[in-house]
Amino acid sequence: MDLPSHHSRLLRQLDEQRRRNLFCDCHIMIDGHTFRAHRNVLYASSGYFKMLLSQSSGNVGQPTTATFDVFSADTFTAILDFMYSGKLNLSGQNVIEIMSAASYLQMTEVIGVCKMFIKSSLDINEKDRDGFLDISDKETGQQTGQCGLYSTGWGMGRYHCNQPEGDIAAYLETSSCTPYGFCSRTDEHPSSQNSISTATMKMLDRHNRIPQIPSSTCSPEEHLRECRILESDDTGCHIEVELPQGEETEAFLNCQTVVQPRSRRRHSLNRATKADEVYAKIMGIKGCLGEDNLPSLHFKCPFCTHTVKRKADLKRHLLCHTGERPYPCQACGKRFTRLEHVRSHYRTIHEAGKPICRWCKRHVTEDSGQVVQEGTRRFRLCNKCVAEVGVGSFPNEVDDDEPTIILSGDEDKEPTWNFHDGIQTSDPEIIEDVSSDVVIHKVDDSDDEIKPIIC
């Protein structure tokens, strides 16, 4: 025969012993606070304490002390109360900290409860938001008829769309009250505004901000007349509002108007008309030209997916496909694909006076080394390396018709290039157009300049 009350009574007795500091054989230090508890309760409640107390099971007569700095004292207080009472005090402020501490202490039940609490809180928030949206939709649906320029769902009454356009135009010209505010009928729905909560009103006010002018030049008696405005130019619907005789003051307060000069209103209409005309012309031009006939703003490489905005950049990019190196060094004859690479090579190698051998990386001079050529590339080798490899392996004579670059002190001056095919150009960044029948050479990516080795 099971007695369910025995478990709760046993927990209450243990909790009372803990609070009175009776038979407590484990001390927990957190942020200068000391928590006293029983080993058996900690061992049975937490996987971390189970592992910790199992290691110190030999010292049964002495109290065990543990220090934690990964969570706060308030968090451990809530967890310790849960161990002795089975009740977890969760709130939106401490649920994350408690779940983190429970994860550290290996308390799976507490982690599950925290996850359920977070999920239920999110569900409640979703329901509240859905309910708020439903209330807003109902209010706006019931209050679609309003006297104003904007549709905010606060208007009252049912209006008749039967006024001719001539009467409205005459009213707008003769009346000193510009009907840009709201005119409401409070006798139809006297308590509709009170049914909306304060949060709903704030949210609606945030999404529908209307200029709030305290009053207009109209008197309360003038507001008792018919307030007719043109609601939409597309449908031609006219709104008519009749206010009762017994609510002059409330009508005067609710029917807020924005005083705007008629000249400014006409100017706005003229500007809108001009904007429509310009937009129609632009759309007509687009329709005549079509999207395919518009000029392209990018240049695409015919050999890869690279795209550039300038034609000069495309021509420079094509050098990596054709294998051309149109910029040679004047001193050693080494060729480069970019002019800035030649200048950097000349400054770091030749102006520094430290040319190095391409193979052994030793410093060479004009006497101890020579320039050799391998295909379109030229580099310097010392006499020892040339003797090891063989003089016949590399031609060491430079053709006179090879293009040279003059690296003078004035680097801004653009040099003139002489190519084999007789084509001359003064722009080092732009080459002739490359047709689709270009032969692509396989180029080794070892054209970077050699940094001198300082011994």
UniProtKB/Swiss-Prot annotation:
Residues 24-92 form the BTB domain. Pfam families: BTB (PF00651). One of its GO terms (molecular function) is DNA binding. InterPro entries: BTB/POZ_dom (IPR000210), SKP1/BTB/POZ_sf (IPR011333), Znf_C2H2_sf (IPR036236), Znf_C2H2_type (IPR013087), ZnFinger_BTB_dom_contain (IPR050457). A zinc finger (C2H2-type) spans 299-321, 327-350. It is found in: Nucleus. One of its GO terms (cellular component) is nucleus. Keywords: DNA-binding, Metal-binding, Nucleus, Phosphoprotein, Repeat, Transcription, Transcription regulation, Zinc, Zinc-finger. PROSITE patterns: BTB (PS50097), ZINC_FINGER_C2H2_1 (PS00028), ZINC_FINGER_C2H2_2 (PS50157). PANTHER family: AGAP004733-PA (PTHR46105), ZINC FINGER AND BTB DOMAIN-CONTAINING PROTEIN 8A.2 (PTHR46105:SF20). This is Zinc finger and BTB domain-containing protein 8A.2. It comes from Xenopus tropicalis.
